[in-house]
Swiss-Prot record:
Family assignment from sequence similarity: Belongs to the DTD family.
GO cellular component: cytoplasm
Protein name: D-aminoacyl-tRNA deacylase
Domain of life: Bacteria
Range of residues in the leader sequence: none
Main localization of the protein described in the UniProt heading: cytoplasm
Its EC number(s): 3.1.1.96
Cell location: Cytoplasm
GO molecular function, one term: tRNA binding
Database matches in Pfam families: Tyr_Deacylase
Example GO biological process: D-amino acid catabolic process
């Protein structure tokens, strides 16, 4: 499992012209599920999403986490994130978990984050064509693995 996280001033995800999730200041996390991702890896990624220090402290140093700031978290499933791009001119998706494996893993990640984060956790709709609107703050973007 991997997450491309972006510090945002706001973000929203829309499906069929309806906003299904939106946050103010916080993190947008695009989530790729890989075959065999374990419960332990999912829990570890949730922990990292909530505790990774990418927000400035009083001195402007990246020293505060989402938990510290109480910011929002918007989780969006994105199987293309787990694509094999090592050769050729077209991505391969054998390195991404199939939907029957990926959807429960993504939903588990959402549930864990909602249980542990009081700042609000929103999510896109798994498997849907989504439009993601965001304002990246910084820009600050990191690729996280459990």
């Amino acid at each position: 499992m991997l997450a491309l996280i972006q510090r945002v001033t706001r973000a929203a995800v829309t499906v069929d012209d309806q906003i299904v999730g939106q946050i103010g200041p916080g993190l947008l996390a695009l989530i790729g599920v890989e075959p065999g991702d374990s419960d332990a890896q999912i829990r570890r990624l949730a922990e990292r999403l909530l505790s990774y220090r990418v927000f400035g402290d009083d001195a402007g140093k990246m020293n505060r986490s989402l938990t510290d700031t109480g910011g929002g978290l918007l989780l969006v499933s994105q199987f293309t994130l787990a694509a094999d791009t090592s050769s050729g001119n077209r991505p391969g998706f054998s390195t991404a978990a199939p939907p029957l494996e990926a959807e429960p893993a993504f939903n588990q990640l959402v549930a864990i984050c909602r249980e542990k984060h009081r700042g609000g956790v929103e999510a896109g709709r798994f498997g849907a064509h989504m439009v993601v609107d965001l304002v990246n703050d910084g820009p600050v973007t990191f690729l996280l693995r459990p």
